[in-house]
Amino acid sequence: MLQPHLVIGSAFTFGDAFFTLFAFAILLVLIRIYAWKPLMGIMKEREEHIGSEIDAAEENRAQSEKLLAEQKSVLQQARVESQTMIENAKQLGEKEREEIVKTARRESERIKEEAKSDIAREKEDAISALREQVGSLSVLIASKVIEKNLDEKEQSNLIQDYIERLGDDK
């Protein structure tokens, strides 16, 4: 048969409720000591780990942005420096070109002046030589004229003959 204390809907007793509450309180204390605190410690540790990972990621992102800005600055500076170097090289090349042209012009003027002075000297030498030859020829002709009395035709033939001899000597 049925036992009276196991029947559903049986009477509620204050002692059973107190014992149940006491057992539940002990269970809560035990759970808090052995499960809740370690679980909360693990959760706190996990929270701190995630927080430190987030902080590290933020710091890495900030460093990356800083490095990117520095690299952009260095790249821009390198571009400016290379442009300056190119401009300087162009200016230096232009100056050297102008200097080479000036030097070539001076050299050509010097050569031209040397050629003019050489021509003038050669001309003077030729004129001197011609004067000497004319002087010698005049003396020779004069001595021949003195030796014989020549008419105009003979005198002309004599001069022509000496001029031809002079041309043959050269």
From Swiss-Prot:
The family this protein is said to belong to: Belongs to the ATPase B chain family.
InterPro entries reported in the protein's UniProt record: ATP_synth_B-like_membr_sf, ATP_synth_b/b'su_bac/chlpt, ATP_synth_F0_bsu_bac, ATP_synthase_B_chain
Pfam families: ATP-synt_B (PF00430)
Main subcellular localisation: membrane
Membrane topology: Single-pass membrane protein
NCBIfam families according to UniProt: ATP_synt_b
Cited CDD domains: ATP-synt_Fo_b (cd06503)
Signal peptide: none
Gene Ontology molecular function: any one: proton-transporting ATP synthase activity, rotational mechanism
Lineage: Bacteria, Bacillati, Bacillota, Bacilli, Bacillales
This protein's name: ATP synthase subunit b
Keyword annotations: ATP synthesis, Cell membrane, CF(0), Hydrogen ion transport, Ion transport, Membrane, Transmembrane, Transmembrane helix, Transport
Membrane spanning stretches: 11-31
Family annotation (PANTHER family): ATP SYNTHASE SUBUNIT B, ATP SYNTHASE SUBUNIT B', CHLOROPLASTIC
